[in-house]
């Protein structure tokens, strides 16, 4: 088999190891896609933004490599508002109507919403079938497709119903980034910046130096950013697959960010609410400011993080109209909390983060109100 000329691979070790493949043209590689299908039943799950560009090609590539496949398809509306129990039920129904057996495979073709929903359906159908992640957004390539965290949202909060279900493979075709809207590219770069902020000062500096190339969608710069981000996440996930300890560090900014997303209403095509990456960007600044207020981080490092996010065109302030008390109420439902006490990922400066139990709510409220 001939390998793509620029293929990068990242191995995720653990009880269920898998490979992240990163290169252009991978969605057309039917043999690569089909090798992960153990049986004959495949459900291709996508959304209304991605499916028109790529679903037919993926279907054709799979059937060319495996003409015996029985292939079903489910397309949901694009946007975080689709990550619901209702759409989860549609995915389960699609698997049932397909006659999917325990050797079936769900292909998640899309961004983080599709990946989370498809992964959760795969985790639950017959107590677990294979899922292959085909991320088409930068955010999904560097974060949500890797690590096996799957979930849907409910009105009370984000990702509150889900399961750990590692994918059989992650296949990231970087050609899909060519059709990614600029706002979505920047949202993904927020998660990329997070990796530098929590564990890699040199990567943080590289991102500053390469910011123009990354924002312009330079393929080489993006491939390097994706591979480095995946390496960071793979290292942590291998040591802590079920988020019992250090994996929580990957959530820098997420407790604040999820509260913003839930309180304002989820970002989606047609509204101006912050999307996930934008909310995480604001959340990282809030976490850094709280860390500085608690004497954990230097104000100069906090400003360096805020500046870098701003240079990438990302928001750094809470949207107007969100009450601090309401945001704190959302934060109290965060999955990292223990015994009803806030447990936050805070910052020690560029390249250092830690989980802090029992954070003073008054200090958090002061940051939210400032």
UniProtKB/Swiss-Prot annotation:
Binding site for Zn(2+): 191, 254, 276
Cofactor: NAD(+); Co(2+); Zn(2+)
GO-annotated molecular function: 3-dehydroquinate synthase activity; metal ion binding; nucleotide binding
Pathway: Metabolic intermediate biosynthesis; chorismate biosynthesis; chorismate from D-erythrose 4-phosphate and phosphoenolpyruvate: step 2/7
Organism per entry: Xanthomonas campestris pv. campestris (strain ATCC 33913 / DSM 3586 / NCPPB 528 / LMG 568 / P 25)
Role of this protein: Catalyzes the conversion of 3-deoxy-D-arabino-heptulosonate 7-phosphate (DAHP) to dehydroquinate (DHQ).
Disulfide-bond pairs as recorded: none
Subcellular location, principal: cytoplasm
Annotated Gene Ontology cellular component terms: cytoplasm
Family membership noted in the UniProt record: Belongs to the sugar phosphate cyclases superfamily. Dehydroquinate synthase family.
Name under which the protein is recorded: 3-dehydroquinate synthase
EC number: 4.2.3.4
Keyword vocabulary terms for this entry: Amino-acid biosynthesis, Aromatic amino acid biosynthesis, Cobalt, Cytoplasm, Lyase, Metal-binding, NAD, Nucleotide-binding, Zinc
Top-level lineage group: Bacteria
Class of the enzyme per the UniProt entry, highest EC level: lyase
Record-linked HAMAP family: DHQ_synthase
Localization annotation: Cytoplasm
Record-linked InterPro entries: Dehydroquinate_synthase, DHQ_synth_AroB, DHQ_synth_fam, DHQS/DOIS_N, DHQS_C
Cofactor note: Binds 1 divalent metal cation per subunit. Can use either Co(2+) or Zn(2+).
GO biological process, one term: chorismate biosynthetic process
Catalytic reaction equation(s): 7-phospho-2-dehydro-3-deoxy-D-arabino-heptonate = 3-dehydroquinate + phosphate
Gene: aroB
Aminoacyl-tRNA synthetase as UniProt keyword: no
């Amino acid at each position: 088999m001939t390998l793509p000329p620029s293929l990068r691979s990242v191995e995720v070790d653990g009880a269920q190891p898998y490979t992240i493949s990163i290169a252009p043209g991978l969605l057309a590689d039917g043999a690569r896609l089909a090798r992960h299908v153990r049986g004959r039943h495949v459900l291709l799950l996508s959304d209304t933004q991605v499916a028109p560009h790529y679903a037919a090609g993926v279907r054709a590539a799979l059937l060319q490599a495996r003409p015996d496949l029985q292939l079903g398809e489910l397309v949901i509306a694009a946007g975080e508002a689709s990550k619901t129990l209702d759409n989860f039920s549609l995915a389960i129904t699609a698997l049932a109507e397909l006659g999917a057996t325990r050797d079936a495979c769900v292909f998640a073709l899309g961004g983080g919403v599709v990946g989370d929903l498809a992964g959760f359906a795969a985790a639950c159908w017959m107590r677990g079938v294979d899922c292959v992640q085909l991320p088409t957004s930068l955010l999904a390539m560097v974060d949500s497709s890797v690590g096996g965290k799957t979930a849907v949202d409910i009105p009370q909060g984000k990702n509150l119903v889900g399961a750990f279900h590692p994918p059989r493979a992650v296949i990231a075709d970087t050609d899909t980034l060519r059709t990614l809207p600029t706002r979505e590219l920047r949202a993904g770069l927020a998660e990329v910046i997070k990796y530098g902020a929590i564990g890699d000062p040199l990567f943080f500096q590289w991102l500053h130096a390469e910011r123009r190339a990354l924002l312009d969608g330079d393929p080489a710069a993006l491939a390097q950013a994706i591979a480095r981000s995946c390496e960071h996440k793979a290292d942590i996930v291998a040591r802590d697959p079920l988020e019992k300890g250090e994996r929580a560090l990957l959530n820098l900014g997420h407790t604040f960010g999820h509260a913003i997303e839930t309180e304002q209403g989820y970002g989606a095509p047609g509204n101006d609410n912050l999307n996930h990456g934008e909310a995480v960007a604001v959340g990282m600044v809030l976490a850094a400011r709280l860390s500085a207020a608690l004497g954990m981080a230097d104000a100069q490092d906090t400003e360096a993080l805020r500046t870098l996010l701003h240079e990438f065109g990302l928001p750094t302030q809470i949207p107007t109209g969100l009450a601090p008390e309401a945001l704190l109420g959302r934060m109290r439902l965060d999955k990292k909390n223990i015994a009803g006490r806030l447990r936050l990922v805070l910052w020690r400066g560029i390249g250092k983060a830690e989980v802090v139990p029992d954070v003073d709510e008054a200090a958090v409220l002061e940051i939210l109100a400032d």
